[in-house]
A protein has these predicted regions:
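Conserved alpha-helical positions within TPR/SEL1-like repeat arrays
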Residues: 13, 45-53, 76-87, 109-120, ...
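Canonical positions in the second alpha-helix
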Residues: 31, 66-67, 100-101, 134-135, ...
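Terminal, low-structured helical/coil segments at or just beyond the last alpha-helical repeat
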Residues: 1-7, 11-14, 274-304
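Structural marker of alpha-solenoid helical repeat scaffolds
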Residues: 34-36, 70, 104, 138, ...
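Residue-level recognition of tetratricopeptide repeat
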Residues: 38-40, 74, 108, 142, ...
């Protein structure tokens, strides 16, 4: 190993560990000038990972491609290409390279996991289920895969299967909030109010800044006409969730309307619109606001 390469590499590593990514990258660039062919793959991985952390997907992709050209059997580089293509919303190429990485490394559990995620976000549930199961077969403690599998089963109305795998996720990692949240969703859909409330609260204890817990609890309270409880939980959400979410103010506005507190509803609706103007079209057709559709302040807020 060239001594200059080694020195630049060590300094770059130290800066990376200290969190100075830009300076670390500059020193890895200097190291590359003195790199032997055998050093390049490791060096390109370092640069790819840094560019990925800097959210420069194109640059990261370029270095993963360089590794692939040097050694087509580097499964991690193919997997890296898939990850970057997914971040660039090129799902076809992402799918292709996840599958290619699995061909090179058949026991690549992370590739199966992220391929399953990719299928899931495209609503290709049967394929997602298949790949999550393969990930679990390779990594029995994959609590995230169990959770994600449970969420899919809930989406396709297979509630017993959903609860079974969500329980497995909790058994493996009791501190992970998502399976509790998803059990709340399942029990809510099954109209089991007390169970849904319990699991949403369990999720909140583990992740108090996750806005969807509060939104789902609010919807649950509204469904059972407990409007004061809906407002109280949204008060708590607005305190705990940062940055502020338009949906929290919107739901609280709806709850105030249920209690005929129109001034407070209008105030929250304005806050919601200020945070996200896309909510305007929804508000125009929302029956919760029917009583104030002709109100001057409402018209001013939504710009009718």
């Amino acid at each position: 190993m060239n001594l200059k390469y080694k020195n630049f590499y060590i300094m770059a590593e130290n800066l990376y560990e200290a969190g100075d990514l830009e300076k670390s990258l500059a020193l890895f660039e200097n190291a590359e000038k003195y790199a032997d062919k055998d050093d390049l793959i490791d060096l390109y991985y370092k640069k790819a990972f840094i560019y990925d952390e800097l959210e420069n997907c194109e640059k990261a992709l370029g270095y993963f491609e360089k590794i692939h050209k040097l050694d087509s059997n580097e499964a991690e580089a193919i997997y890296g290409m898939a990850m970057e293509y997914e971040k660039l919303d090129n799902f076809d190429l992402a799918e292709h390279f996840y599958k290619e990485s699995i061909k090179v490394k058949p026991n690549y559990d992370r590739a199966y996991f992220f391929l399953a995620n990719l299928m899931d976000i495209q609503d290709r549930y049967e394929e997602a289920i298949e790949y999550y199961k393969k990930s679990i077969n390779l990594r029995a403690d994959d609590y995230m895969a169990y959770n994600n599998l449970g969420a899919i089963y809930e989406n396709i109305d297979e509630f017993d299967k959903a609860l079974e795998v969500l329980d497995k996720s909790i058994e493996i990692e009791p501190s992970y909030f998502r399976p509790y949240f998803n059990k709340g969703v399942v029990y809510g859909r099954l109209k089991k109010y007390d169970e849904a409330l319990y699991f949403y609260n369990q999720a909140m204890q583990r992740k108090k800044d996750y806005s969807f817990i509060y939104l789902n609890l609010s919807a649950l309270f509204i469904e059972y006409k407990e409007y004061e409880k809906s407002i109280a939980i949204l008060d708590k959400a607005i305190k705990n969730v940062s940055p502020p979410k338009s949906s929290l103010y919107y739901n609280r506005a709806c709850s105030y309307m249920k209690l005929n507190k129109k001034e407070k509803a209008l105030k929250d609706l304005k806050r919601s619109v200020d945070l996200n103007r896309d909510i305007i079209d929804y508000a125009k057709s929302d029956p919760d606001f029917d009583e104030i559709k002709n109100n001057e302040e409402f018209i001013e807020i939504i710009g009718v």
